Amino acid sequence: MMRLVLDTNVLLSAPMSPASPSAEILSLWRDRKVTVLTAAEQIDEITRVTRYPRIRALLHPALAGRLVNRLRDVATVVENLPIVDRSPDPDDNYLLAIAERGEAQFPVTGDEPPLGLERHKSTRIVTPAVLLQLLKDGGK
């Protein structure tokens, strides 16, 4: 099964935009067609970000809570993350660390360019739309 790291922006945009590529990826995860990797750092970030008034206005707190619970209960929680210092945004380095330690095929982000990088080691960093196209094409 394909192993993915979903950037927080992908996880939060999915429930806010039900017809989006991000929402389609969450549906694949819900249907157990992909494995999602996370870490305590990301769960903490989502918990913090979903308390911001502008996010609460777009994402009902109960829905945010369900997302956090699903990450804790269903995603593969990766521990002992390596130190990574590659992203132009230092706050995104933990996503690359999750991908590295969890042996993800793809970190998926809504950022353009993806996390400011095309690759981390041998892992290609993609947007949700690119990932869906890759899945349609057989993961190549």
What are these regions (language model features)?
Residues 73-107, 112:
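Active-site neighborhoods of divalent-metal-dependent phosphate/nucleic-acid chemistry enzymes
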Residues 8, 40-41, 110-112:
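Short secondary-structure boundary segments
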Residues 89, 102-106, 112-140:
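Acidic, PIN/NYN-like endoribonuclease modules and their adjacent C-terminal/linker elements
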Residues 1-38:
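Short, well-structured N-terminal submotif of metal-dependent ribonuclease cores
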